[in-house]
Amino acid sequence: MNSWRDNVRKVEPYTPGEQPKEEGVIKLNTNENPYPPSDKIKQAMSGIKNLRKYPDPAATKLVEAIASYHGFDKEEVFVGVGSDDVLAVAFMTFFNGKKAIFFPDITYSFYPVWAELFGIPYEKKAVNDAFEIQKEDYYVENGGVVFPNPNAPTGAFLSLEVVEDIIQHNQDVVVIVDEAYIDFGGDTAKELTRKYDNVLVVQTYSKSRSLAGLRIGYAIGNKELIKAMNDVKYSYNSYTMNEPSIVLGTAVLEDEEYFQETRNKIIDTREWFQIEMRKIGFSFADSKANFIFATHESVSAKEIFEAAKKAKIYVRYFDQPRINNYLRITIGTRDEMETLLDFLKEFTATK
């Protein structure tokens, strides 16, 4: 009996970063923005009405606002419940062949989860010792390509020349450039979507826009790609975007000054923090994201991770090959990073 268990889908799920509930925590483990959203959010809240009704299935106002902000037509923008939702829809829509899709071995750990969930064959391509993608690995025949730029969890950034080279060698499949962290120092590949009809660029409100709690992500691509994604989305959930996300996601794009101010604060803090971390024995590649991926010359990452957690400082540790002696540290406020730095100086000095 109990034969229903034989029909349960067996998957190894994605493991999200810890969300501590206790007070007084310095939370530097999930790459959230340390600054509050723009005041435009508060002003726009009064415009959230008719919650008893379903939201606009097309999220037209939000799509139009994103399209206008980036200089594209609304038919070239797809929105979803965070970039995870956008990426999942893209996987379902474009990766349906028998050939393996390619992505880096050290990368966003949701990629293999989606591939397994949707029955997509895949191959991981090893990054080099500096955690850089080797473009030549993507020259061979495949069923699609996806990679973050900057990469997560390493922060390594590919130049647009390298990104375009990968695209040029893969014009028969869809190439997804996952730009969750692009606003912290890199050059976006969005303009390449005008040149190549197989390129999809994915971005999010969760990092640079301080709106991780609203879950807003989007993709930019040619109209045919976007229509295909909407067709898939409407086949399982036509109301993915809720009304608050549509209203507030539209409003936040109106405050460019605040966006640039907080973005630059994070970049400045990151550059200062990298200098200070090297002074106390940490090494890492220069990051173009809102985090660094660091290892210490003599103290193990796991030991630092556990001690920091006891001190109510949360960073991210990945217990997996090649990166199990590294910590991913989100860039918080200057005060938060000074507190972490003081802890690290004291802790590593005793080892």
Tell me what each language-model feature is:
Residues 123, 128-183:
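Active-site phosphate-binding strand-loop segment of PLP-dependent enzymes
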Residues 161, 306-311, 316, 320-351:
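PLP-dependent enzyme catalytic core of the Aspartate aminotransferase-like
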Residues 93-116:
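Conserved PLP-anchoring active-site segment centered on the Schiff-base-forming lysine
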Residues 59-100, 298:
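Phosphate-binding glycine-rich loop
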Residues 267, 279-311:
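Conserved PLP-binding catalytic core of the aspartate aminotransferase-like
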Residues 1-53, 141:
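N-terminal "arm"/small-domain region of PLP-dependent enzymes with the aminotransferase-like
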Residues 198-278, 282-285:
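PLP-dependent aminotransferase class I/II
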